[in-house]
Amino acid sequence: MHKRQITVAVVDDDPNILGSVRELLNANCFITEIFASAEGFLASGVIPRVDCLLLDIQLAGASGVELRDHLEACGSKLPVIFMTGLADEALHRQALNAGCVALLHKPFLEHQLIDAIEKAVP
């Protein structure tokens, strides 16, 4: 495991996902910040403290891909892990082409999430 605690921001409009992922990450000694929207994440001011962004592709309001594109346009190098419950191949390609570190399919296993974070924040 890492020598310092890693802060992971999670953006998903499903409160059940937010709660489950927060519990899983906290149990694995990660600091977790959760947000129900891309807009809430951007307005929070946490970006400078975040090491990795776990981001749902399909959100109400701005999509996960739009948020990732916005961050990149602002010069952010924040590593992004996309997650989705959709089986849309075109959407998956769009997410991978957007430069994410990993794409997790909901429901995902604990080790898949931890492995993706460790890949994103070596």
Model-derived segments and spans:
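Acidic catalytic/metal-coordinating carboxylates
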Residues: A36-S37, S63-E66
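The feature encodes the CheY-like receiver
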Residues: L18, A60, D88
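Two-component/phosphorelay signaling modules centered on CheY-like receiver
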Residues: P15-E33
